[in-house]
Amino acid sequence: MKNDKLVNILAPLCLHLESASPTVHIVKATPDMYDKVGLLEEEQQIHKAVKKRQREFRAGRQSAREAIKRLVSNDSELAQVPILSGKAREPLFPSLISGSISHTDSLCLAACALKSEVPSLGIDVENNTSLASHLFSSIYTQSEKALMETSNTLPDALIFSIKESLFKCLYPFVQVYFDFLDAQITLQPDAENAGQFHFELIGENRTLLQANLPNLSFHGHYCFTEQYVFSLCFFSS
């Protein structure tokens, strides 16, 4: 899949907003990025990892660096800051950048924005395949399960993807793991295969999580094709 085709597919997600504010850049890893050796500190983090993990890690960092270059073309040094992994295996971007990385077996995406405009963001891509029925109760709330049961078009992986991107977006603020069932998702379709989403924190962790969230505008977007499910969310200043 070429980058220009990818951008067209992801247009409903607003992932390439060069003329808008806030600007979010997304980059799809090219085949060479999977085997391109990264910065020394990055390589030290993965030298004991299996080959598959090393390739995914490198592709994510290389695509993230390309997104940073497009975002701040006048600061080439910023793109040479190592993107290491935090305690939750989250990528640690340069202090001026908010970013997120996601991958399947065949696709790797990185999204970046200026932290002054977008304090936090999360991106996720999943294969558009069926979920095992025994997983539904650990991912879907009753409301979400009812929505999926009455829809003939929504992919099984959509709510899963949305909650993955939501975790990435919220984690920098809450700094704790939270469960799939701690958030309830509502969809606002803009088209048959794309739209916006909103979330509500529920469950026994609600008060703790809510207390650490910023008082900022939240934006959630999703779309899907026959092959992939995409989601993106971010807070904007």
What is each of the regions a protein language model found here?
Residues 1-237:
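Core catalytic alpha/beta fold that binds nucleotide/phospho-ligands
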